[in-house]
Design a protein with these regions (language model features):
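Short, Lys/Arg- and Gly-enriched loop/turn segments at beta-strand edges
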Residues: 199-209
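Extended boundary segments
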Residues: 115-159
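Short, structured beta-strand/loop micro-motifs enriched in basic residues and often containing a Trp
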Residues: 166-178
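Helix-rich terminal scaffold detector
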Residues: 1-98, 110-122, 133-138
Length: 212
């Protein structure tokens, strides 16, 4: 019973963390915010933990995130292919503007990340995989993590003009698998602004471009 209770508490906390991260990205999370620990326990037993979340109404670029809890067994390429077929092709719940988030019990290993790279390069489908344990806290709330913000094309243009940047290759990179990059939903070629404390000014901005 205690093991079941511990698992339920982890699932409950992971959902809270994911909802907080997605809300920060501009997604409308209220439909999922009021579930209790007992309700999460029941949903886990019935395999109903998945969430489909859209960004806020009136957004210039409508997009969705589908959260899939894959907890029973090791995640394999065939499982990922099945999820892609169901969500992107057969049911067409998601488009290539959207994101599939998969939560697993293991830490994603390099062969699994290589599969995600291949899917992104060949199909343009963006998938984030989280280890359940890493969702027990919100990395964006850590005191040592400076604020990271994905900037739009207009701000990228201004930044390049200001720093006389003519080629993206001169920008420092941040991996799409960096914990903070994942937390803010960065895709390859996205650019983020990092706001850090500075000795010579109250804050200073740094920029990173997302890589595979």
């Amino acid at each position: 019973m205690s093991q079941s209770s511990g698992t339920t508490n982890k699932l409950f906390k992971s959902r809270q963390t994911l909802l907080a991260l997605l809300k920060e990205q501009g997604f409308e999370t209220k439909d999922y915010e009021e579930f209790s620990v007992n309700e999460v326990h029941t949903m886990n037993n019935n395999k109903q933990l998945d969430m489909l979340i859209s960004n806020e109404e009136g957004s210039d670029k409508p997009k969705k995130v589908y959260v899939k809890y894959h907890l029973a067994k090791t995640l394999r390429r065939e499982n990922i292919n099945d999820y892609i077929d169901d969500l992107f092709h057969l049911e067409q719940v998601l488009t290539k503007n959207d994101t599939l988030v998969i939560v697993i019990k293991q830490e994603p290993h390099e062969p699994l990340l290589n599969i995600l790279n291949q899917i992104w390069e060949s199909e343009g489908i963006f998938i984030i995989i989280y280890n359940l344990e890493r969702l027990l806290f919100n990395i964006l709330e850590h005191s040592y993590v400076p604020k990271h913000v994905i900037i739009d094309e207009a701000e990228i243009k201004l930044m390049k003009e200001r720093y006389n940047i003519t080629d993206d290759s001169v920008l420092p990179t941040i991996s799409r698998y960096d914990p903070v990059a994942q937390a803010i939903g960065m895709r390859p070629k996205d650019v983020c602004k990092i706001v850090r404390s500075s000795k010579t000014a109250i804050t200073a901005n740094y920029y990173r471009i997302c890589s595979q």
